[in-house]
Amino acid sequence: MKQTECTTILVGKKASIDGSTMIARSEDGGRVIIPEGFKVVNPEDQPKHYTSVISKQKIDDEDLAETPLRYTSAPDVSGKNGIWGAAGINADNVAMTATETITTNSRIQGVDPILDPSEGGLGEEDFVTLTLPYLHSAFDGVKRVGYLVEKYGTYEMNGMAFSDKDNIWYLETIGGHHWIARRIPDDAYVIAPNRLNIDTFDFDDSENFATASDLKDLIDEYHLNPDREGYNMRHIFGSSTIKDAHYNNPRAWYIHNYFDPDFGGTPADQDQPFICRANRLISIEDIKWAESSHYQDTPYDAYGDQGTPEQKKTFRPIGINRNFETHILQIRNDVPAEIAGVQWLAFGPNTFNSMLPFYTNVTTTPEAWQTTPKFNLNKIFWLNKLTAQLGDTNYRVYGELEDAFEQKSLAQCHKIQHETDKEVKNLSGKELQDKLIAANQKMSDTVYNNTVELLGQMVDEGHGLMTLKYDLLD
């Protein structure tokens, strides 16, 4: 069974550079490569009957009876372990990313244990497919996932986010059948690694907090709260382990200090705040840099020269060989609703790729992003994997080439996006969608060709650096 170990970044509309809401996540797998694709699920393609592959959980048809909306997704292309839709934006400009694998503790597992997959229940395989096509607001996502978790249960610990043009909500599942959610303030950002992240919680503030109806009673009845005052959900339901200090907390610490150099602290800090404010407005480039980061300019950078070999292996970076798909789901507020939804997407290790902004009001995706299960250099997923594995052999040489490639690609995509926004201003219906499909194709071709060019530059630079060589000076 695949489990993804991700890094989620959330940015409220007053914290972003252009007034948009942004929810982002890197989808990281394990030692086996998991090819990811990009597709549009049109209403006629949405399942009317659904059974999970992993848990064999059958969903009651009544829970799929509502007319589904069109939505984008980034599924596993093999389908062997289910759909794993990962992230997308639907026709009502509601976005969802799911899931972040998070932590738990023995106290709550002794009260409401997660299910064994043999018992049924839902997991990361299922949530996007069963949720996103039925949402008309971000809070609808909280309500629907809460309902599904209470009814069917879950065999995993899950974190997920929902957004519309105004609001972002982050939800975490608790045990097998409970959940909590918090609205992210408009002027705030969140960094959520693979641990239970929500901290302070106000049961009396229904505008900003939501939960399974019996959760407060459950906390009190089973004496789950270690704090003398208030409710800190990370303390109650989460973890504070040595693994957190090496695997989770350092990722958050590094990005907090990138967004606010006065943040301070140490990488292992267990109580880093969930809700934070940056010292500037946050851009797409900031989020991509964060999702690509590997502790640059610290002793913990595996590519750097400041640390010892031991220090370089101390903490897990965000940018890693196991990044298979990364997205930023952006709902813009300065353009018409028909072009407001943008799914920024990249495949492969983030340190060596570039994102591009796909319009989501479309009915199909570029061929290069419809990944094949087997290696195929016509597909951007496999081209990025090859580029990253070559780049990793000598980052000092290849890193500057990648930086130039990424800046060039982002600039070209921004230009295409600006031009398209203006060109389609007075269009609607199929004519509009056709223009957006064409713009997506143009950006896809641009980034694909730039990646091929980068690979060629890396081959040129690396020719003289091979170990197997013998120079004849004659």
From Swiss-Prot:
What's known about how pH impacts activity here?
Optimum pH is 6.0.
This enzyme catalyses: an L-aminoacyl-L-amino acid + H2O = 2 an L-alpha-amino acid
Similarity remark? Belongs to the peptidase C69 family.
Q: Where are the transmembrane segments?
A: none
Alphabetized, the UniProt keywords read: Dipeptidase, Hydrolase, Protease
Subunit structure, interactors included: Homooctamer.
Q: According to its UniProt entry, what is the function of this protein? A: Hydrolyzes a wide range of dipeptides but unable to hydrolyze dipeptides containing proline. Highest activity against Met-Ala.
Could you tell me the Gene Ontology terms of the biological process aspect for this record? proteolysis
Its protein name is Dipeptidase A
Matching entries from Pfam families are given as: Peptidase_C69
Top-level taxon of the source organism: Bacteria
EC? Answer: 3.4.13.19
InterPro entries recorded for this chain? C69_dipept_A-like (IPR047804), Peptidase_C69 (IPR005322)
Explain how this protein's activity depends on temperature. Answer: Optimum temperature is 55 degrees Celsius.
Protease keyword on record: yes
GO MF terms listed in the record are:
cysteine-type exopeptidase activity; dipeptidase activity
Give the record's free-text account of how this protein's activity is regulated.
Answer: Inhibited by Zn(2+), Cu(2+), Ca(2+) and Cd(2+).
Active site positions, chain numbering:
6
Underlying gene: pepDA
